[in-house]
C-alpha cells in the first residue's frame, strides 16, 4: 500500500449548475445548488485514499459548521487528520464554483488555509519520512510550500508540486521537487515565459522534471530528453472540477510503478472523475480504474 502525505487546502465548495456563465452585471436562473467538500489538498487526499493509499493530510479548518462537516467527511474517507489544525478564530475555506457545459469558473476564499504553517510541516516530519510520496499545492502560504519541498528533498521522499494557482517560483524550489505538474498556462507562469510558446519547448527549459496536463488531450511528461505523450481517454464530461486533483493523486499513488505507467493511470483516473458532479463525486476506486483501463485496452 502506498503511503501518501498531502499538504494543502481544505474547502467547502459552493456549487451552482447553470445553463451558461454570466457576464458582468448579468443575472440568470441557475439549475441546481449544492455544497460539496473540496480544496486541492482535500481533493488529492480523498482521491489517493479511494485508490487504496494510506493518506495523511496536513492543513487547517475553521471551528465552524463547514469545518465540522469537512473533517467528518475526510475521516469517513479514511484520511488521517492528526495534522489538520482547528482554528477557533478563522473561517473554513470556501470555493464558489459555477458549472456550465462541463466547464467551471471558481472563486476561492482561503480562510483557515491561509494559516497552514511551516511548523505544521515540521511536526509531520515522521509521517513524511515514511511516505512514498508527498503532494503539495499552492492554495496555502508559499513559505509552507517551500518547507514541504525542502523537507521532502532532505528526507529523500518524492515531492510532487502541483503549482495551482500558479505564480513564478524560485528555481531552487523547482529543482528540489521530484515532479512539477502544471498545465500549459501554469508552466508559462512558473517560468516567466510567454504562454503562447510551444509547451514542449517550455518543458525542456524547466529546471526539473515536468508532467504537463492537457485536459482531454492527456498529458506530456519529461524526465530527460524529449517529452513523451500519454493520450487522454474519451468520456462524457459532466463536471471537470477536481480532475487535476485526481490526476495528481493517482500520479503519486502509482509512481512506484514507473512514471509512464503512473501517468497513464493518472489520465484514466482523471477521465473517470469528470463523469460525475463535484470535485470528489467522480473520483474512482481501484476496481473501477482497473476495469476502465481493461476496457480501453480491449
Task: Enumerate the predicted regions with their spans.
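Glycine-rich phosphate/adenosyl-contacting loop at the front of the ribokinase-like
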Residues: 1-60, 65-76, 237
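Short, glycine-/polar-rich solvent-exposed loops and beta-turns at beta-strand/coil boundaries
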Residues: 88-90
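Ribokinase/PfkB-type carbohydrate-kinase core domain
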Residues: 1-10, 71-86, 98-228, 294-297
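Aromatic/hydrophobic pocket-lining residues that form π-stacking "cages" and hydrophobic walls in ligand
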Residues: 44-45, 70, 148-150, 269
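Short glycine/proline- and charge-enriched loop/turn segments
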Residues: 21-30, 181-183, 228-231
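Conserved phosphate-binding/catalytic region of the ribokinase-like
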Residues: 1-4, 168, 195-298
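Gly/Ala-rich phosphate-binding loop of Rossmann-like dinucleotide-binding domains
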Residues: 49-50, 153, 256
Amino acid at each position: 500500500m502506498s503511503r501518501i502525505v498531502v499538504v494543502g487546502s481544505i474547502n467547502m465548495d459552493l456549487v451552482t449548475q447553470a445553463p451558461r456563465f454570466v457576464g458582468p452585471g448579468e443575472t440568470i436562473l441557475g439549475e441546481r445548488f449544492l455544497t460539496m467538500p473540496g480544496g486541492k489538498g482535500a481533493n488529492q487526499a480523498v482521491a489517493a485514499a479511494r485508490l487504496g493509499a494510506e493518506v495523511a493530510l496536513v492543513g487547517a479548518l475553521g471551528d465552524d459548521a463547514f469545518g465540522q462537516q469537512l473533517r467528518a467527511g475526510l475521516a469517513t474517507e479514511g484520511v488521517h487528520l492528526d495534522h489538520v489544525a482547528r482554528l477557533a478564530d478563522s473561517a473554513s475555506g470556501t470555493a464558489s464554483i459555477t458549472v456550465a457545459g462541463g466547464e467551471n469558473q471558481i472563486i476561492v476564499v482561503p480562510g483557515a488555509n491561509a494559516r497552514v504553517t511551516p511548523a505544521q510541516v515540521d511536526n509531520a516530519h515522521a509521517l513524511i519520512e515514511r511516505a512514498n510520496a508527498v503532494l503539495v499545492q499552492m492554495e496555502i502560504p508559499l513559505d509552507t510550500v517551500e518547507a514541504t519541498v525542502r523537507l521532502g528533498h532532505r528526507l529523500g521522499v518524492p515531492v510532487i508540486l502541483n503549482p495551482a494557482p500558479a505564480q513564478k517560483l524560485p528555481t531552487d524550489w523547482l529543482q528540489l521537487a521530484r515532479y512539477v505538474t502544471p498545465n500549459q498556462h501554469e508552466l508559462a507562469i512558473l517560468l516567466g515565459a510567454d504562454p503562447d510558446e510551444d509547451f514542449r519547448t517550455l518543458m525542456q527549459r524547466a529546471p526539473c522534471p515536468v508532467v504537463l496536463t492537457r485536459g482531454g488531450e492527456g498529458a506530456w511528461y519529461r524526465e530527460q530528453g524529449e517529452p513523451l505523450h500519454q493520450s487522454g481517454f474519451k468520456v462524457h464530461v459532466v463536471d471537470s472540477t477536481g480532475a487535476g486533483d485526481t490526476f495528481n493523486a493517482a500520479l503519486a499513488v502509482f509512481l512506484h510503478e514507473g512514471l509512464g505507467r503512473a501517468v497513464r493511470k493518472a489520465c484514466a483516473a482523471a477521465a473517470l472523475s469528470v463523469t460525475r458532479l463535484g470535485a470528489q463525486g467522480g473520483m474512482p476506486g481501484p476496481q473501477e480504474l482497473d476495469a476502465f483501463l481493461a476496457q480501453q485496452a480491449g
